[in-house]
Each structure stands twice: as C-alpha cells, then as structure tokens.
C-alpha cells in the first residue's frame, strides 16, 4: 500500500521509542539505529540500560545526543519501561526490545492508520536468526482484515487474542497513562499486562504485514523450549494476565472475568499440560490436574464459542497424547510442539 507522505505527516502524531536493555550489547546498537533511521520527524528514542555488565553501555553512549539514555541498577524490564514511559512525551509509544529491529517505514505506516479511540496498533513480526536473516513464520497467525470488534470479542471471552510480542505493538499514550506505572502485582514482563488490558480501553487495529524483525538467538524469553521450567512460568503469567484484566474491568466498568476462564483457553491448555508433565512441583494453577486437563481438552474442542478448525482438532489430539504417553515420549512431543511452534492457534479464522 502506498501513502502520500504529506497526507500522513499532516496527522502529526509523535512517537516515543523506548528500548529497555540488559546485556544485549551485541544487538542493542542495531535496535537503536533502526529507531533513529525511521523516516518520521517527530520521534524520540529513549534507551534504559538496566544494569548491564557487558559492553552495552559503551554501545549506547556512542549514539550521543541522538538518544535519551538512562543507566540504572538492574531492576527488571517492568521498572525499566516504567522509567522510560515517565520520561517520554510521544502520542504513540513503542517498547522496542533491544534485540529487535524496526523495519524502515514502520512509523509512517503506523501513523497512517492511527485515529482517536485506538489503544494500540499491532503489526506482524518476522522471525530472524541471530544475524537478522529471516527464518520461520511471521507472527501472529491472524486472518487478514480482522476487525477491532472481533479482537475485542475474543479477548473478553478468553482473556487472549492474536497479538505479536512486545516490539510489534504501538501503544496509545492515552491508554498507557491509565495503567502506568505498573507495580509489582503485575507481571515482570510489560507485554503481559499491556496486551491483556488494551482491548478494554479502546480499539486494536492490525496492520497485516511485518514491520518488525524479531531476532531469535536462544536467549529469548519466548523460547519456551530453552528450559523445562519455562512452561510453569507461563502458566503463572496467566494469573498476572487475569489480574491485569480484572484491574481493567474495574476501571472501565466491564464485567469481571471469572477464574474458570483460565481453563477455557486452548493455548493455556497446552502450557498447563507441558507444565504438569515436565515440572509438576512448580505448577501453580489451583485446582488443576492432568485429569482436568484431559477433560478440558474435549470441552474446549466441543463447546468453544469460536468456529472449530483443523488446528483445533490437532490441538485436541496433541493434548491427549501429551497427557497419556510415557514421560520421555510426552517430553519429546512437548519439545517438538513448542520448539518448532507448530499448532499455533489460528484465531479469528474464517
């Protein structure tokens, strides 16, 4: 799609690109450069170094006055982004992970669809290897032309909807002002809370083309197959997501979601099974068991309020096998599913 630059620029939203970095010295320079190279005049780049012990600080300082840099002790991503947001002034906020890259023209495309009442604009992200070469699938898997109303409906039903990871989201300052700063009751990852709460404060607009390069290098937080305990961590994040949504509902007057909604989500079902099979002592979902997950597999498939698809059937089969197979076979199935990211739910599908 082609845009008239003068028409887009007349809208004049300003951008704040906030980069929280911790020990990604080999990547953070690329992230900063991709932000500075955006063909949008009204932008600021804010870099928060969260106590790095590698060469990150020297890399950041090389950009001089082109970036607004802060160097703090290590407190985690949530606190780094709290600081970054407090120092920002843009109408639109992007929390760019320090190992990711904004594709040229990203700000212009985001600005072209920006309008009042939007809580976030989300874009597709292209996976790359550690050197930035495209590999694997584009995320999220989502039907072209999906509407904000469809996303909102799914979020209200399942506390979940198709969303890219952090760098693929451009947030309304008006929305973030209502929820920031995020305190310790929220998840340590900023994405968890912002993504969960956004549908309750405004429209979510999707640009169905990749505008971010998502670097995969083995240390990514989203690489669940890196460690067995990661699945239990993700299940625990479901609590934080539920808490965030409850806060949003109290603030906006929406009905409070019930705890049982956590057992009606097909993606969380897979994480629950992986958590209970691999690290059962760290599984932290009260009332959960493999027996319950077995029954939930059928309930989700048979009684889901969204149209069933081929992937839903495959998820049912995978879930049953991952529950009943001997430990070593179940572990292989879990690793195969999450390391290759097969059975990623096709949501909001035709």
What are these regions (language model features)?
Residues 2-230, 349:
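Nucleotide-sugar donor-binding/catalytic module of glycosyltransferases
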Residues 157, 188, 213-350:
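C-terminal subregions of glycosyltransferases and related glycan-biosynthesis enzymes
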């Amino acid at each position: 799609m082609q845009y008239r630059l003068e028409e887009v620029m007349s809208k004049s939203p300003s951008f704040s690109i906030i980069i929280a970095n911790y020990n990604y010295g080999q990547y953070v320079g690329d992230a900063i450069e991709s932000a500075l190279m955006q063909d949008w005049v009204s932008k600021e780049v804010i870099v928060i170094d969260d106590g790095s012990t590698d060469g990150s600080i020297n890399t950041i300082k090389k950009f001089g006055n082109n970036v607004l840099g802060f160097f703090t002790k290590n407190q985690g991503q949530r606190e780094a982004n709290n600081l970054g947001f407090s120092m920002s002034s843009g109408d639109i906020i992007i929390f760019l992970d320090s190992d990711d890259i904004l594709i040229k023209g990203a700000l212009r495309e985001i600005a072209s669809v920006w309008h009042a009442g939007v809580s976030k604009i989300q874009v597709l992200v292209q996976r790359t290897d550690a050197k930035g070469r495209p590999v694997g699938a584009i995320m999220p898997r989502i039907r072209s032309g999906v509407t904000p109303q469809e996303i909102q409906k799914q979020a209200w039903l399942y506390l979940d909807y198709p969303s890219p990871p952090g760098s693929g989201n451009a947030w309304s300052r008006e929305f973030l002002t209502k929820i920031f700063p995020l305190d310790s009751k929220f998840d340590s990852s900023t994405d968890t809370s912002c993504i969960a709460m956004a549908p309750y404060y405004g429209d979510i607009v999707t640009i169905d083309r990749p505008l971010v390069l998502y670097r995969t290098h083995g240390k990514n937080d989203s690489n669940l197959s890196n460690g067995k305990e990661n699945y239990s961590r993700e299940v625990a994040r479901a609590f934080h997501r539920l808490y965030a949504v409850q806060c949003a509902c109290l603030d906006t007057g929406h009905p409070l979601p019930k705890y049982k909604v956590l057992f009606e989500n097909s993606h969380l079902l897979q994480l629950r099974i992986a958590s209970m099979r691999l690290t059962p002592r760290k599984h932290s979902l009260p009332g959960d068991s493999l027996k319950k997950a077995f029954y939930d597999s059928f309930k989700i498939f048979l009684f889901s309020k969204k149209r069933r698809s081929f992937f839903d059937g495959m998820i049912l089969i995978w879930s049953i096998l991952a529950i009943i197979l001997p430990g070593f076979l179940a572990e292989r199935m879990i690793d195969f599913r999450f390391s290759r990211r097969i059975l990623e739910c096709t949501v909001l599908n035709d």
